[in-house]
Amino acid sequence: AGIPALLRNVGLLAGKSNISDAAATKFENEVQELARIAQGKTLVPTFIEIWHDPLLSVNGEHIMSEVVSLCGGKNVLANLPILTPGIGLEALLEANPSAIIGGGSAVSEAEFRRVWQRHRSVNAVQQRMIFYVNPDWIQRATPRILLGAKGICEGLEKARRYAVQ
């Protein structure tokens, strides 16, 4: 992502390059560590929800999809031509993801999980591999995306471990 470059540019404009360079380097190092941990592991088919009514997701060009890839997940809708496609239940059932990531449409994690319980025929719902992420941490290209990425990586690792049992 272009977050490190943005940090460096803002620091340059503000005359604080030493601070922004350190922040950008720290960000890059944390991203590299997350990638290292997921490297070589089985990809987890993942559905990314950004809204539940109507059901909306993201394709592979969205930053949330990049985070899922970083964590060793595979966005089941990555190849769709629209950045934020509407999804019918049939398409979701066909994709049958092993993990569901989201949180943008829910007031709370409990509500997010409750809404998904209506779709018990989806593998991720059956296996309880539904992971809520604070939308402020994952839906914007800022350094805070690392907070969301860490949660997603933990969730996908849990789904991966469950799949090999």
Give the location of each predicted region.
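N-terminal ligand-binding lobe of clamshell/alpha-beta domains
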Residues: 1-165
